[in-house]
UniProtKB/Swiss-Prot annotation:
Function (record text): One of the primary rRNA binding proteins, it binds directly to 16S rRNA where it nucleates assembly of the body of the 30S subunit. With S5 and S12 plays an important role in translational accuracy.
Organism: Diphyscium foliosum (Nut-moss)
Biological processes, Gene Ontology terms: ribosomal small subunit biogenesis; translation
Record's protein name: Small ribosomal subunit protein uS4c
Family annotation (NCBIfam families): PRK05327.1, rpsD_bact
Amino acid sequence: MSRYRGPRVRIIRRLGALPGLTSKTPQLKSNSINQSASNKKISQYRIRLEEKQKLRFHYGITERQLLKYVRIARKAKGSTGQVLLQLLEMRLDNILFRLGMAPTIPGARQLVNHRHILVNDRIVNIPSYRCKPQDFITIKERQKSQGIIVKNMDLSQKYKIPNHLTFNSLEKKGLVNQILDRESIGLKINELLVVEYYSRQA
């Protein structure tokens, strides 16, 4: 399944606020779920599916990519759900978004693809690049690159930078301090339901 490129408002009407996808927050339609015994299995599946879709659309990844992350998380020590969130949060495109250097994760991905971003003084053009503690992120020394980031930062001022990251606004430099904890996730999600959804596939 390819990455979603359709109307973003339609997605957040169905799934709720997804700040990585869009800053818009339209009113949600009331959606009553039939709680009868005959529909119980269907509704439980739907709940798990929607939690999985939240992760996909928020982080802007394909179904295949998400399944790959789930498989990696299953092999790691600790809670599978928490490790999954950490893997997604440490992607370079998401780090740029959380630092306020891009208004959305698709916007951050574009910065990386267009070679505006350096990690540890080296250009990285892979949005899925996995950042690690003590990595520092800077902007290419070009007027165009600098101008794009400054404009993005003005748009992103309403978001608070999480504790596992630091941003020096004068030097336009971000630092990954540590692996984030569960409380720093910028998305309302029940990751255990996502793990359950993939229990037969991963």
